[in-house]
Amino acid sequence: MAVDVKSRAKRYEKLDFLGEGQFATVYKARDKNTNQIVAIKKIKLGHRSEAKDGINRTALREIKLLQELSHPNIIGLLDAFGHKSNISLVFDFMETDLEVIIKDNSLVLTPSHIKAYMLMTLQGLEYLHQHWILHRDLKPNNLLLDENGVLKLADFGLAKSFGSPNRAYTHQVVTRWYRAPELLFGARMYGVGVDMWAVGCILAELLLRVPFLPGDSDLDQLTRIFETLGTPTEEQWPDMCSLPDYVTFKSFPGVPLQHIFIAAGDDLLELIQGLFLFNPCTRTTASQALKTKYFSNRPGPTPGCQLPRPNCPVEALKEPANPTVATKRKRAEALEQGILPKKLIF
């Protein structure tokens, strides 16, 4: 067995360093057997309290879920093996991510481009939800793009099966800027709505080319949501007041969506409105979103091979042109590391 693991580790030739997080390092590599270019996520084993059978629980969850999933818009897990004090996950190599595309100001994102990105995101998410899995960490840099322009959902370290009656979950999931209001109010029982709210934030970011609701804290995040979308009433969200961390907010009227997304047509505004419904029980699902007029109306989505590719080095695009946004993003991610391990793409 030890020989087999060692031979599997030697099967991959490291080509380049791609990134590093608190618990993992990512490399570009070549599979010597097939000549395929892959990405290897090498995870450092957690402390005893964080590990199960010597494997970090987050990694174990990611392996288990990805082994059961197969969809064109979900990252493929090609191999997984332990070696020395690490566990390595081998993935499809992806050229870039949606965050890089959004930040590259040399690229023009047309309505057809945005529709293509949203179509692939929702198709992958619909598959997940049909298989009773919540992603729980959707954001632009977890939506990866390969050399053919195919978008794939990635980073399943926080993903979770759902559907068991009365099963409680942690509310400290999803990066704050993409976190649904029910999570910010401390909901322990939730469903697909948390992913759909994040999709709404990603769609808004594609349209605006900046993060839509970049809050500094959970309280600030809720304030930004209500100032922008209006403070919900009990009629709009019946169970709001019973949530564990609910606090009363000033009644904000909100800004009409057409004043925020000035170039959006009625069909797109209707989709955005459905994704940002406060009541998670009535919030648009992935299947419902795919059936909206937005996707059946013209223009059609751009084919993957014709989607824009970044013109600038990825490293430069990871530092936004707007230093305020860059600082806030780093601060938000740093604060959340006190609760959650730092997330990495692969």
Curated annotation (Swiss-Prot):
Post-translation changes: Phosphorylation of Ser-164 during mitosis inactivates the enzyme. Phosphorylation of Thr-170 is required for activity. Phosphorylated at Ser-164 and Thr-170 by CDK2.
Alphabetic keyword roster: Acetylation, ATP-binding, Cell cycle, Cell division, Cytoplasm, DNA damage, DNA repair, Kinase, Nucleotide-binding, Nucleus, Phosphoprotein, Serine/threonine-protein kinase, Transcription, Transcription regulation, Transferase
Localization in the cell: Nucleus; Cytoplasm; Cytoplasm, Perinuclear region
Single GO MF annotation: protein kinase activity
Gene3D superfamilies: Phosphorylase Kinase, domain 1, Transferase(Phosphotransferase) domain 1
Modified residues (N-acetylalanine): A2
The keyword Transcription regulation belongs to this UniProt entry's keyword annotation: yes
DNA repair is among the record's keywords: yes
EC number: 2.7.11.22, 2.7.11.23
CC per GO annotation: CAK-ERCC2 complex; cyclin-dependent protein kinase holoenzyme complex; cytosol; fibrillar center; male germ cell nucleus; nucleus; perinuclear region of cytoplasm; plasma membrane
Residues the record lists as Phosphothreonine modifications: T170
Pfam family, one: Pkinase
Record PTM Phosphoserine, positions in chain: S7, S164
Regulation (activators, inhibitors): Phosphorylation at Thr-170 is required for enzymatic activity. The association of p53/TP53 to the CAK complex in response to DNA damage reduces kinase activity toward CDK2 and RNA polymerase II repetitive C-terminal domain (CTD), thus stopping cell cycle progression.
Residues at the active site: D137 (proton acceptor)
Residue runs in coiled coils: none
Binding locations of ATP: L18, G19, E20, G21, Q22, F23, A24, T25, V26, K41
Stored InterPro entries: CDK (IPR050108), CDK7 (IPR037770), Kinase-like_dom_sf (IPR011009), Prot_kinase_dom (IPR000719), Protein_kinase_ATP_BS (IPR017441), Ser/Thr_kinase_AS (IPR008271)
Main location: nucleus
Quaternary assembly: Associates primarily with cyclin-H (CCNH) and MAT1 to form the CAK complex. CAK can further associate with the core-TFIIH to form the TFIIH basal transcription factor; this complex is sensitive to UV light. The CAK complex binds to p53/TP53 in response to DNA damage. Interacts with CDK2, SF1/NR5A1, PUF60 and PRKCI. Interacts with HINT1.
PANTHER family: CELL DIVISION PROTEIN KINASE, CYCLIN-DEPENDENT KINASE 7
Job description of the protein: Serine/threonine kinase involved in cell cycle control and in RNA polymerase II-mediated RNA transcription. Cyclin-dependent kinases (CDKs) are activated by the binding to a cyclin and mediate the progression through the cell cycle. Each different complex controls a specific transition between 2 subsequent phases in the cell cycle. Required for both activation and complex formation of CDK1/cyclin-B during G2-M transition, and for activation of CDK2/cyclins during G1-S transition (but not complex formation). CDK7 is the catalytic subunit of the CDK-activating kinase (CAK) complex.
Family: Belongs to the protein kinase superfamily. CMGC Ser/Thr protein kinase family. CDC2/CDKX subfamily.
Descriptive protein name: Cyclin-dependent kinase 7
